[in-house]
Amino acid sequence: MKLLYTDIRHSLTKVLVAEAESLVAAGKRVFYIAPNSLSFEKERSVLECLKTQASFAITVTRFAQMARYFVLNDVRQGQSLDDIGLGMLIYRTLTELDDGELKVYSRIKKDPQFIQQLMDLYHELQTAQMSFADLEFLEEPEKREDLVKIFTAVTAALNKGDFDSSSQIAAFAQHILAGDTDEELADLALVIDGFTRFSAEEEYLVGLLHRKGVEIVIGTYASQKAYRAAFREGNLYQASVDFLRKLAEDYQVKPDYIPHAEAEDAFGRISKILESRYDFSESTVSLSESDRSQLQIWATMNQKEELEYVAKSIRQRVHEGVRYKDIRLLLGDVEAYQLQLKTIFDQYQIPYYLGRSESMAQHPLVQFVESLERLKRYNFQLEDLLNLLKTGLYGDLTQEELDHFEQYLRFADIKGAGKLAKDFTANSQGKFDLDCLNHIRRRVMTPLQDFFKSRSQTASGLLAKFTEFVQAARLSDNLTALLQGESQQEQERHEEVWKAFSHVLEQFAQVFADSKVKLDDFLALVLSGMLLSNYRTVPATVDVVKVQSYDLIEPLAAPYVYAIGLTQERFPKIAQNKSLLSDEDRARLNDATDSQAELQIASSENLKKNRYTALSLMNSATKELVLSAPALVNEVEDSMSTYLLELTAAPLSLPIIVKKPQASSDDIGSYRALLSQIIELHQEEIDREWTAEEQTFWAVAVRVLRKKLAAEGISIPHISKELKTETLQSETLQALYPQEQPLRLSASALNEYFRHQYAYFLKYVLRLQEEWTIHPDARSHGIFLHRIFEKVLQDDSSADFDRRLAQAMEETSREAEFESIYSESGQTRFARQLLLDTARATGRVLAHPSGIETIGEETGFGSASTPFLTLENGRAVTVSGKVDRIDRLTKTESLGVVDYKSGDIKFSFEKFFNGLNSQLPTYLAAIEELADYQEDKGTFGAMYLQMTDPIVALKDTKTLADAVSQSMKPLQYKGLFVADAVKELGPLYEKNKTNLLSQEDLDLLLAYNAYLYKKAAEGILSGHFAVNPYTENGRSIAPYVEQFKAITGFEANLHLGQARQLEKLDASKFDRRPTGDKLRQAWLEKMREEMEK
């Protein structure tokens, strides 16, 4: 055995390749061993260092792969199980154990994460050269008994099923011990590169090979100073020196230091200064400004900016002649950066390769399996069924059929297998074609129902049922259709997923064989196997930027290296133990077992491993290195790593470069990046004055960009400060509003028009509707209460009011229309109870009419024969609607209108003037059309009655009488009243002076109401509908006013100037704010002025 070490700025690979070539010259077959994470990259490095550029006698590989070469042709006694099969076997073993047999893990024995932890521990014990019997040394008795029992059962299941899940290294070691490979080992040599520790299994294999006379060369990085130091704790090279010293002691070999003749560079000098700092020795090394320029420390605001600066720098280097393959990007947190990395590098057109396995979880086939599993587990929840259909792999539904089916399922809130098994019957005014929908339902549900009827049966029987199901679901045909038009790369990915799917089913058949399995367990196991599957990751070309986690880097990896995301939380990485064995358990097992057996204790390795990783990172570049840390990662604040801050302290004294957006030509990376940069700079303020040269540069850059976009046929969408709408053409207007027919309006349509013209266009012209639902909403609640009061008031029996009310509530609740929607669930039954409480409370008002008689309920008004008004061009306008209740004063026979409201609504002159509150005036005008109306008797008012169950805070009352009085206040009639009739009205009517009208006032009010309808009608017939939501305060738009932002694109910060400002009283005309009569008169005068314009 030969042990070598060299300085970190001297290529160890070159040294070891030279050793390998000399071994080949001596007739040896050389295995060049690298760690798992570096083997692919190391193969390229070795080829670059070979004098002949290639060699059939040198194989670059990993320990496990090397072992596979020697056992590949073995006739293995058992069937081979991979991790998917092993996980299934563990699952099967745990289900066969009774709950009472496990004291600690009984409740989680089917949990996928627990099974994964057991599988990890299984492999870890193999790697550590320990047997399951060694778990007897655990201190906690219950945990010890459970783990021993589980692994004993797993071992028995492996033996019974003739399965083999042993590692390749263990199998190779058995051959070495048996002497089966002595002839092959005679010409074997090992060169081991990149290790600072061996696992117990690797160490055992190296020992066996050494004893068989195999020549072994092991190399690592270390300084002579560190190796000779008596005290190594805290040294940067502690990990590699401890590794060397242990090997030297075990094999009685003195490590050889390999000097190098190259001149020391900036990174070498920085490394020596850092080494002296950590071993508390004096350093005479100094840095020049040229040295400091080769290592930069960046500080950025967030990871997006950080990636953009890196991308711009890469493009600049490529412009200067650097190849992408000469650039390495290291990430402090791959998960946090992965999505934005793709977005920004695609924007800057930088090819890259992220050497990380990609899960198949988002593939439609995996989602198909997941939806099946969830449908069975959760009994056909709506979203699970829709997800299955939307994979495109189930059935033969067209997109139109799927849309209609989904719309109905959401309307009727179909959940559960019971509802889906029955024909659909719920409908809304015949809007759904139930025959067509039930035909779709049968096509969807028949294969699922047949498959889910499967009870516990053997694995072979279950797989046969599953095969029938996927054939009925046309899975194969749908997958074939999915491949149409796809690129070669995408087709290969689909093929990988299908192979993984087939492999999971094969492993299931192999593991469970004749065992009985429940359908739920089968689907869960197949899903688990699919989620464990990953795509192969191979770079498409050689000339790409390689991206990897910083802790996988080795010295001298690339000429230019960018390491980003180096915050305190991520650099250094603190390995955490998440296994079933705690650090204390591991230490106890290590002490109790053979010296060759050892479980890794992450916490004890953290410090020296992280120091060595930091040193490797500092020496990863051969020319220039950039270390960067953002202030925010995933919107969470973090600080710069202490390793980076150490570089800023004397004598290194490296400056921290704070990166900010600047209008610099250095920031240009590509046309896409230029476009992004111009938009970003346009939206943000520039923090310095531009020079004339910079202004000229950016002016030219914008012109070039515009020409490029024009050549590509690309236009830049922009947010205009003015939203314009197209006027409807005359043909369209004629189709919508024929000349020979009157224009039909209503109080709610008028309100919508003056609230926002374009909203009127969407609702009343295009007739857009909200998504239908079978569940009761505000509209159905209102109809329910209206029906109760209608029945009460129409009941002429001599029974007292409370009895009549109770009977009306009972009859209304039993009506088919309401029984179907208010009896469906506990939630709807609770809503009905609240409505009945409201009816009882509001009924107290109806019980005391006090000189009032009701002569009509739900009375309609407005017809083509009697137009509401006629426009100047002779066009008739009708206003239609329905009045909830018409009352008559028994003494004067004047009429009044009552409108039931669920909210506390009051008449406002300001809103009425602006067209936003015309309901009551419209009702007053409508009374004059009624047969019961007598002009000489007139009207006494129009009012709202709030349907509510009042709540009174007792802390605001002094006596019980006060509480009763307070509870009746919300239950008053509130609205407009004719002053002469007020004396006939009781205490249930709110007599606000502002709303008491003389006959002259009433006539003016009705005239202005007609003026509003005329103004709206002329605007509607013109065919122009502006985007002009109203604003009350001139600063913002209420959400209920602008509900169509996604359609109109209205943004308050850009388009507030288009909003309609509400007209208000001129405060300068009054000494103080008017109230009562003065307020009414002021608004009436303003109406008169408006109509006279």
Curated annotation (Swiss-Prot):
A GO biological-process term: double-strand break repair via homologous recombination
Example GO molecular function: hydrolase activity, acting on acid anhydrides
Keywords: ATP-binding, DNA damage, DNA repair, DNA-binding, Exonuclease, Helicase, Hydrolase, Nuclease, Nucleotide-binding
Lineage top rank: taxon: Bacteria
EC numbers, comma separated: 3.1.-.-
UniProt-listed InterPro entries: ADDB_N (IPR049035), DNA_helicase_suRexB (IPR014141), P-loop_NTPase (IPR027417), PDDEXK_AddAB-type (IPR038726), Restrct_endonuc-II-like (IPR011335)
Database matches in SUPFAM superfamilies: P-loop containing nucleoside triphosphate hydrolases, Restriction endonuclease-like
UniProt cofactor(s): Mg(2+)
Protein role: The heterodimer acts as both an ATP-dependent DNA helicase and an ATP-dependent, dual-direction single-stranded exonuclease. Recognizes the chi site generating a DNA molecule suitable for the initiation of homologous recombination. This subunit has 5' -> 3' nuclease activity but not helicase activity.
PANTHER family in the record: RECBCD ENZYME SUBUNIT RECC (PTHR30591:SF1)
Subunit structure: Heterodimer of AddA and RexB.
Family membership: Belongs to the helicase family. AddB/RexB type 2 subfamily.
Miscellaneous comment as given in the Swiss-Prot or TrEMBL entry: Despite having helicase-like domains, this subunit does not have helicase activity.
Protein name, UniProt field: ATP-dependent helicase/deoxyribonuclease subunit B
Source species: Streptococcus sanguinis (strain SK36)
